[in-house]
A protein has these predicted regions:
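Glycine/proline-enriched, intrinsically flexible loops and inter-domain linkers
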Residues: 1-790
Length: 790
């Protein structure tokens, strides 16, 4: 069989000619990269090969600028069942009915597509992350969505509001139809996201250890013939070039053209495939027959990435694919489009040839895919070989033939980094004459006000296993196994304003806050994932920001140890890197490392929420207040700029507080708990009084006099130094204080809960804040409504 006649004469062209030709074909490789490809395969590449390498060597797929830095992250721990080498990581959850169960977690970004087509971009982000978890053999039990948008009150307010509306609609329309509960997320607004919103997505699942499916051709393929089966929607041209698009700078003038790189979702087909239905039927039958299969989601890079990566992940395999066997939804598609389009709701399976007909019948007849979506089906598209070559045929010609590991291994750059000087200073200002009014201003500000306006559209209780819904605490909680009391907590965090000042502490604080939010509901942190959203790695100062962010995440994970294991890091078991979040004008997003944490609690009945429960309980502060208002909600709400003194994580004290809180909750000493972050101690107290709906009936009286230690009252109240506010049940104070002492934590009693629905804060005899819960709730609940509706 002949090689495709559409070869690119790399060896004969000048740099200018080669660069121009690749631009004509929409190939984003550099000239040097194209010449390197020719060297690696030993000849001039075909046009299809260049397209495939274009996606495989994109930043999105190859991590070519970030690989070296990612090695800083700790990925191993005694509880890790599968680290970050596949579509999702797995960490031990519990033993139940004689089986070991794991939590599966994946974390991705869909930033560029959501800026161009917000609804479709966000929806397909949810779809992709759910596939990542499903293809590990897991039952998907929850999602979360950390979102970053531009300034809703600035010069681009109309566009920002349009993007927010589209993203939120995409998330609920897809997630609700799919039947996966939304367990939480967070939202930040900042002008740096005007031209590049961030839509990060997290999904978690549950799987028995003996039912884990790997994204690789199994070793059994050396003993009997295996084939590749493509399942799902018919391939079209949607998302063609999507991975390359996600690896370039956004240009507003090209957004119309870029829309073709955004995929088209179909949650109803996904529901049939993923939600313990067709895919699970195939997996169950394989287990019954003692057959080992491989399964991989087809997302970024399309069939090219899915088929090559499942092959390369095996040991010593190649694959031979016939593109005419691929079911398509459009006639006349070129082979490069069939290979690289990112049509949604697709998987690739590696199964024994003797099992293939039964697999096809399960999808096509039992689950009737062709009638669920026109043209959807399962088809055998190729066979596994032992020559370690990646061979693809189309109409009698070989369009790709290269060593499979050359295709998938990508390249690696050592980028230049240069520290970015920060010129900001701490603002010099007189304390507000009315701290009650100042607190109301902060409570109504974009980055503090209630997110109920957004999450009320999400179905958080589908599946019937949700214990804590969005708004009830800083982490969502789900009880996934019937007859088992163990529960999983999920939190996501990362403050971009910290990253603007110091990306290292931005990364470290993201880890610490995610772990605190799990701890505050009673869950012991078990593992982390990260999504590293940064600017252009080819610019030394922006690459320095990225490196510092990674270092911050890594140092926090290493120093906030896994409970019960001295000096054993809390492992980072999955993640994603999103670079080139920069506009054509050269403006990049605020350095935004976003971290998710999963925690475990043995008894869901011990779970704790934010809202104060009953009068007469003691209220304690864990965590000293420092002059750390850099990047704070207080400075932002009062128009005081960024500041400089960003919160720092004091490893030993942070670790001690986290595990003191989880132990206290496990003993039943705690009625309510809130971590201290955005808005500081003042906002934490207010949120505990208000509860998720702004209508709490239990207030508190707090004396912060002993907290001040020379700090001005407003700085102590609004400092975002880390910590917790804890409501301790009446009669449990002595035991709580003793438990804290065992951890080396000094609890400071602020006061007690009261039954008059008021928040009163004083410093000795000086009253600082006196507000009704109703007045706070009105401002806090309606803040986002007013901001987004104009």
């Amino acid at each position: 069989m002949e090689l495709d006649e559409r070869r690119i004469a790399v060896s004969e062209m000048s740099d200018e000619e080669l660069g121009a030709l690749m631009r004509v074909h929409g190939i984003g490789l550099t000239v040097a990269e194209a010449r390197r490809i020719a060297e690696l395969i030993g000849r001039d590449p075909t046009l299809v090969e260049l397209h495939v390498f274009n996606v495989e060597w994109s930043e999105h797929c190859s991590y070519k600028s970030s690989k070296r830095s990612l090695r800083l992250l700790p990925t191993e721990a005694p509880n890790v069942m599968l680290g970050p080498q596949e579509d999702a990581g797995i960490v031990f959850f519990t033993e139940h009915q004689g089986r070991r169960w794991g939590i599966v977690i994946a974390h991705e970004s869909h930033n560029h597509p959501s800026q161009v087509l917000p609804n479709e971009g966000a929806a397909t982000g949810i779809g992709g992350i759910v596939r990542d978890v499903d293809c590990m053999g897991a039952r998907v039990i929850g999602t979360a969505d950390p979102l970053r948008f531009g300034d809703p009150l600035g010069p681009n307010a109309d566009r920002t509001r349009w993007i927010v509306s589209g993203v939120v609609d995409g998330i609920w329309q897809y997630g609700n139809a799919l039947g996966v509960p939304n367990l939480g997320g967070d939202i930040y607004f900042d002008p740096s996201f005007d031209d590049n919103c961030l839509v990060n997505v997290v999904a978690i699942g549950i799987v028995a250890e003996d039912e884990i499916i790997h994204s690789a051709v199994p070793p059994q393929a050396h003993d009997e013939p295996y084939v590749l089966i493509l399942v799902g929607k018919p391939t079209d041209d949607s998302g063609f070039g999507g991975s390359a698009f996600a690896s370039k700078i956004l240009d507003e003038e090209q957004q119309t053209q870029d829309r073709g790189a955004v995929q088209v979702p179909d949650p109803f087909l996904k529901n049939v495939l993923a939600m313990r239905k067709a895919n699970e039927a195939v997996r169950t039958r394989a287990r019954e027959l003692g057959i080992v299969i491989g399964m991989k989601d087809i997302g970024g890079g399309g069939l090219a990435c899915g088929s090559s990566e499942i092959t390369a992940a095996g040991d010593g395999f190649g694959v031979d694919i016939d593109l005419r066997a691929v079911h398509v939804g459009l006639q006349g598609l070129l082979p490069e489009t069939i290979m690289c389009a990112e049509t949604q709701e697709r998987y690739v399976l590696a199964v024994p040839e003797r099992f293939a007909e039964e697999v096809l019948a399960t999808y096509n007849a039992d689950w009737d895919l062709p009638n669920v979506y026109e043209g959807a089906c399962a088809r055998v598209i190729g066979r596994v070989t032992e020559d370690e070559m990646y061979t693809v045929r189309f109409d009698g010609q070989i369009v790709i033939q290269a060593p499979v590991r050359v295709v998938t291994s990508g390249i690696e750059y050592e980028r230049e980094e240069r520290p970015r000087p920060f010129e900001g200073t701490e603002p010099d200002f007189a304390p507000p004459p009315d701290l009650s009014a100042a607190l109301l201003t902060v409570l109504g500000s974009p980055n503090v006000c209630s997110r109920q306006y957004v999450y009320r559209a999400y179905d958080s209780e589908v599946q019937g296993n949700t214990v804590l819904r969005p708004g009830e605490a800083g982490a969502g909680v789900v009880r996934p196994l019937e007859g088992c009391d163990a529960a999983v907590a999920l939190s996501v965090d990362g403050n971009p304003r910290y990253g603007l000042i110091d990306p290292y502490w931005g990364g470290a604080n993201a880890v610490a806050e995610a772990m605190r939010n799990c701890a505050a509901v009673g869950a012991v942190p078990q593992a982390l994932t990260d999504c590293l959203n940064f600017g252009n790695p080819e610019k030394p100062e922006q690459f320095w920001e990225f490196r510092q962010g990674v270092r911050g995440v890594a140092d926090a994970a290493r120093n906030l140890w896994l409970k019960g294991y001295v000096e054993t890091p809390t492992p980072v078991i999955s993640g994603n890197v999103s670079l080139y979040n920069e506009s054509a004008s050269g403006s990049s997003v605020a350095p935004s490392p976003i971290v998710a944490c999963v925690g475990v609690m043995p008894d869901f009945a011990r779970v704790v929420t934010v809202q104060l429960k009953q009068p007469g309980d003691a209220v304690y502060l864990l965590g000293e207040r420092y002059d750390e208002l850099g990047g704070s909600a207080y400075y932002s709400a009062l128009g005081l700029g960024l500041g400089r003194n960003v919160p720092q994580v004091r490893w030993e004290a942070e670790r001690a507080r986290i595990y003191a809180v989880t132990d206290a909750i496990a003993e039943g000493l705690v009625a309510a708990c809130q971590d201290i972050s955005d808005g500081g101690l003042a906002v934490a107290l207010a949120e505990m009084c208000m509860g998720p709906f702004g209508r709490g009936e239990v207030g508190t009286e707090a004396d912060i006099g002993p907290v001040l230690n020379g700090l001005r009252a407003d700085r102590a109240l609004f400092s975002e130094s880390s910590g917790f506010v804890v409501e301790v049940r009446a009669g449990c104070e002595r035991r709580f204080e003793a438990l804290c002492a065992e951890h080396g934590v000094k609890p400071l009693r602020l006061g007690e809960t009261v039954d008059d629905a008021q928040l009163r804060v004083s410093a000795g005899s000086q009253q600082l804040i006196a507000l009704s819960i109703a007045s706070m709730g009105e401002v806090w609940l309606n803040g986002l409504v007013h901001i987004l509706q104009g």
